[in-house]
Amino acid sequence: MIACLTAANLVAAVRLVHDILSNNKLFANNANGLLATGGVIWATNVIAFALWYWDLDRGGAAARAHYPQANPAFVFPEMLHTDYVPANWVPKFVDYLSLGFWTATAFSPTDISAIKPWAKLLMVSEAAVSLVIAALVVARAINILA
């Protein structure tokens, strides 16, 4: 299911980039439509990658529930500051959603570090897609409004 969401969003992103680069008339004078479309694709990208992080880290949510400390791919601040969290703390979906949001917004890790190669590659992929969408959509919208 996550793969379907990711594939559909990738197709939408590629079509949007193609429409922008080919000067498609769909967004010729419609900055609001362009920004809304880009925003939906960007937000879906954040959610899709958050789902990937959540599903793949430590074997998924079910495996984390049984073996919370088993082989993490990400180091969360709560893992380093154990005085401030319960002893049995494990990451929840909101932790992976914040990872997805900050990766897409800052184009880099913030307070959550990837320590497995696959996790680093996922973060690079998410940041690259977000950068392309943000740069092209904002540049084209400014061009339309100017």
Residue ranges and their predicted role:
Residues 14, 18, 53, 57, ...:
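Membrane-water interface at transmembrane helix exits
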Residues 1-16, 40, 44-51, 98-102, ...:
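Hydrophobic alpha-helical transmembrane segments of multi-pass integral membrane proteins
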Residues 31, 35-40, 68-73, 107-124:
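Hydrophobic alpha-helical transmembrane segments and immediately flanking/interface helices
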Residues 91-146:
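Pore domain of cation channels
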Residues 58-111:
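Membrane-proximal soluble regions of multi-pass membrane proteins
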Residues 25-62:
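Pore-domain transmembrane helices of cation channels
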Residues 40, 44-47, 84-92, 117, ...:
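Hydrophobic alpha-helical transmembrane segments
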Residues 18-26:
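Long, contiguous internal "core" modules enriched in hydrophobic/ aromatic residues
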